[in-house]
């Protein structure tokens, strides 16, 4: 109780500190469901984004497009990694038990993901616009190294914008013994006029993140889309590529997940002077914050659903890992001689039986070997479409989303 009066608090925060813990059975049931959903989302987000990073970073040819997706997945992975701690906060009764330093770090990861996502989506839209509007310039300057440099600059800018949220984040004890991890606008240089300082700082943070992390990226995305559409219409091209559909899906998810959070942040800033908004802001912010967290879970699903090649690579990567584990386990019970003979048989079978011959024999079992060889000598033009599609798939670019 003594700790509550030691720190100067803003009026809104003082009101939140006095709120008792709810004892309604229906609300407790909602809390249990919320903990379950957040736990599943945290597990799903970690697995999804980890797999996307592995596939895009290790299994696909590195292009400018894969560079953007790689950094977006890294941002989402950071947010997903912080979600289990938020789930623990909900599970122990909405009380932060992990200390002040980790409170600052956990909140900073949330805002870092917010800024990084907005900045990276803006860069992707500008990159697409330059490809269409300035193709010669893009061909000369658009490289993977340049894309990585741009991403590093955007990460630095996101970290810079996250600093105020790290500075003003604090742990505040409640009246009922629980601990809040929230803004304390009077934590640093409170000044003589408490109400003015709280109102100014809260509005400055809410408006700045609304503009820099939401409105400005949306304006860049919209203007880039208009420029690309006009240029393609002028050239007589109306085809929508996979990468365009992927970006559109990510932008829609970004708006739906982050839009409500920014609206309630502005309401919270307004609630310092308009007391009637305080209950609405305090009730709605936890829900929209969870919705913003779920954006890091939705994005990997969009990558897989929009790009079939991503799903193919993901399946093949999982199959390769599983096969390696099973082979290692079976090798433990066999001697080195048997392992060598088994590898030799695999090499011999792969060299003596080409894949195309197996496919042809499977497709045309009625052909005898002599007739099959004669039929194959007529030329590759008569090969089954199944064989040609597989060869084209191997030779094609792995970054199918550029089309």
From Swiss-Prot:
Ranges annotated as biased composition (Basic residues): 338-348
Disulfide bonds: 103-198
Record keywords: Cell membrane, Disulfide bond, G-protein coupled receptor, Glycoprotein, Membrane, Phosphoprotein, Receptor, Transducer, Transmembrane, Transmembrane helix
Segments of this protein annotated with the region Disordered: 332-353, 384-403
Glycan attachment points: 3, 21, 24
Modified sites of kind Phosphoserine: 330, 349
Listed PROSITE patterns: G_PROTEIN_RECEP_F1_1, G_PROTEIN_RECEP_F1_2
Post-translational modifications reported in the UniProt record: Phosphorylated.
Transmembrane segments: 35-55, 72-92, 105-125, 148-168, 210-230, 246-266, 285-305
Record-linked PANTHER family: CHEMOTACTIC RECEPTOR, G-PROTEIN COUPLED RECEPTORS FAMILY 1 PROFILE DOMAIN-CONTAINING PROTEIN-RELATED
Protein name: Prostaglandin D2 receptor 2
Organism: Rattus norvegicus
Gene: Ptgdr2
